[in-house]
């Protein structure tokens, strides 16, 4: 069994969603597919909610653009008329809920963390609804029912004991294709919507892979894998074939935005490898990440270089 995660760029357009369909349907074993919101939608939801909280009536125009974006994608990816109308109705039901929440934010000029978390959750709820009707035989699941968080030091963290138990119960038996919205979770204590942070869809996929002992976690994105350096700075940079978990973590923590760093922890402890793949170049082998370190072959002592712009690192030490 594999877990595949597709990011916002991978589900951002009609063409990319159809590429996802082709990739998933070519796999001949059970898969869990985790999707992010359509590319740019999370930022759009945050921007729209902030405008509403500030009493800016122009939020309605931004919200209208969000509605149009989703309806256009549905129109482009679902050819069956009856199914398309059904998905449009369900999507409009979610969008109507979202519109009512935004209207409330506008009227009281206030946006709480709880309300913001609820608003951004609609991105993944909508994208997963759409993609689940594009991939043949896909069964849609609601991650709010099995990804549970607790609050520690004013931050939501995953309750792995309850989450793992719920995941195993939910995916028993395991369908041929399971479709799961990433990023979204709920509080263990009160059931309120929470989230796993920006990039949290990677983390969702890692949690699922760990709980279900997947053979591999595949992160499908818009690059061929980890690069030896930022290709925008070093034009001779190339894809790194293999990395250890430690090496990948170091690169991620210092600027390589290929994987959300917390993603690595769960699969590391279960020794489940990660493979970075490119949705737009699916034949590329990508980067394979595991516990095993490659032996030095005399060619390159340094695997890769990453950096964080406009940041100073200060080390203070004493005798």
Q: Which ranges hold each PLM region?
A:
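Nucleotide/pyrophosphate-binding catalytic subdomain
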Residues: 1-264
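Glycine-rich beta-alpha junction loops
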Residues: 38-39, 223-225, 274, 278-283, ...
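Preference for bulky hydrophobic residues occupying beta-strand positions
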Residues: 182, 274, 314-316
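Short gly/pro-enriched beta-turn/loop segments at secondary-structure junctions
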Residues: 212, 269-270, 307-311
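Conserved glycine-bearing catalytic or ligand-binding loops at nucleotide- and phosphate-handling centers
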Residues: 255-285
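A conserved regulatory-domain signal marking ACT and ACT-like small-molecule sensing domains
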Residues: 285-319
């Amino acid at each position: 069994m594999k877990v595949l995660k597709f990011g916002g760029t991978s589900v951002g357009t009609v063409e990319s969603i159809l590429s996802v369909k082709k990739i998933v349907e070519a796999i001949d074993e059970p898969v869990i597919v985790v999707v992010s919101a359509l590319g740019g939608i999370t930022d759009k939801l945050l921007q729209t909610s902030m405008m509403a909280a500030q009493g800016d009536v122009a939020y309605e125009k931004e919200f209208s653009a969000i509605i149009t974006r989703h309806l256009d994608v549905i129109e482009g990816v679902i050819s069956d008329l009856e199914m398309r109308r059904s998905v449009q109705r369900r999507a409009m039901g979610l969008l109507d809920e979202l519109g009512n929440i935004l209207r409330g934010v506008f009227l009281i000029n206030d946006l709480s963390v709880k309300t913001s978390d609820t608003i951004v959750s609609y991105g993944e709820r909508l994208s997963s609804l759409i993609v689940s009707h594009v991939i043949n035989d896909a069964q849609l699941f609601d991650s709010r029912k099995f990804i549970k968080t607790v609050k520690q030091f004013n931050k939501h963290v995953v309750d792995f004991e309850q989450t793992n138990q719920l995941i195993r119960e939910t995916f028993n038996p395991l369908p041929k294709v399971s479709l799961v919205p990433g990023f979204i979770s709920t509080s263990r204590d009160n059931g309120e919507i929470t989230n796993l942070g920006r990039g949290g869809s990677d983390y969702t996929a890692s949690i699922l892979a760990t709980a279900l002992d997947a053979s591999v976690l595949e992160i499908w994105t818009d690059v061929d894998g980890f690069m030896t350096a930022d290709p925008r700075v070093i034009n001779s940079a190339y894809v790194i074939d293999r990395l250890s978990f430690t090496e990948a973590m170091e690169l991620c923590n210092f600027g390589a935005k290929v994987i959300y760093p917390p993603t690595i922890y769960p699969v590391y402890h279960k020794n489940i490898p990660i493979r970075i793949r490119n949705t737009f170049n699916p034949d590329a082998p990508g980067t394979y990440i595991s516990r095993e370190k490659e032996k030095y072959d005399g060619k390159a002592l340094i695997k890769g270089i990453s950096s964080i712009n406009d940041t100073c690192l200060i080390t203070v030490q004493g005798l």
